[in-house]
Amino acid sequence: TSNIHHPSFVNNIDTIITPFTKEDFEEFQPDILVTFGGMVVSKRIKAFLRKYKPKHHWHIDPLRAYDTFGTLTHHFEVHPNTFFSAFYPLAQKVKSTYSSQLAHVKYLRKQKHDWYVSKMPFCDFMVFDKVISNLPKNSQLQISNSSAIRYAQLIDIDPSIEVFCNRGTSGIDGSTSTAIGAAVANGKPTVFMGGDIGFFYDSNALWNNYIPNDFKIILINNGGGGIFRILPGHEET
């Protein structure tokens, strides 16, 4: 969800850490955590770093510092490019298996993911996987909040596709409006994926008469509120 890509990056963090044991969490507890950018989608990575705290947490942002994990030790008030341009020449290489171990776990998870996808029955996750895997290159994917973005972050998305989602609104506010506005602003072919509850909540967005002709909506009509079937206590809702 960062729209930053590299072969060594982990794009689907929940698939990596969900099966972790206590020993795995302790093994991958970081000494230094460096963050930049906006809100973190994954609840699991937040829970991991809040419990297995790094010794140092540096956040890089010209304006604000998010203490998402309750561990912030320093705020560098510069652009990330400026920070890394100055910091990288000062860094010293050390012997560590952290990266290779993580790469191995990533490989194993990918094998299991591919096997599961090939065997799974028709379900919400299959729909998201099929649609996202067939999006046109260099397009923009706008995703509704709640379960939609959580499914999407389990899927490998083509690096040429920009991904956006409303976060920090504690719900489904304005996802369709945001998607239409983004489609108008950047001119890229835009696909909006969301559930029926989120779609109808913001259906007034479709009253606008300037919606681009290539703007597409994929509506997952799964009976409403898929997130409530995922969260604890869903039996009582």
Residue ranges and their predicted role:
Residues 37-41, 63, 146-148, 197, ...:
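Short glycine-rich anion-binding loops that position phosphate/pyrophosphate groups of nucleotides
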Residues 1-56, 158-186, 200-204:
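Glycine-rich, anion-gripping cofactor-binding loops and their flanking helix/strand elements
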Residues 1-2, 57-62, 216-221:
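Short internal beta-strands
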Residues 104-188:
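Active-site diphosphate/adenylate-binding microenvironment
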Residues 5-13, 66-75, 226-235:
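Glycine-rich, charge-decorated loop segments at or immediately adjacent to ligand/cofactor-binding or catalytic sites
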Residues 52, 57-101:
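Terminal amphipathic helices with adjacent charged low-complexity linkers/tails
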Residues 2-5, 60-66, 147-148:
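Short, polar loop motifs at secondary-structure junctions
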Residues 154-237:
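Thiamine diphosphate
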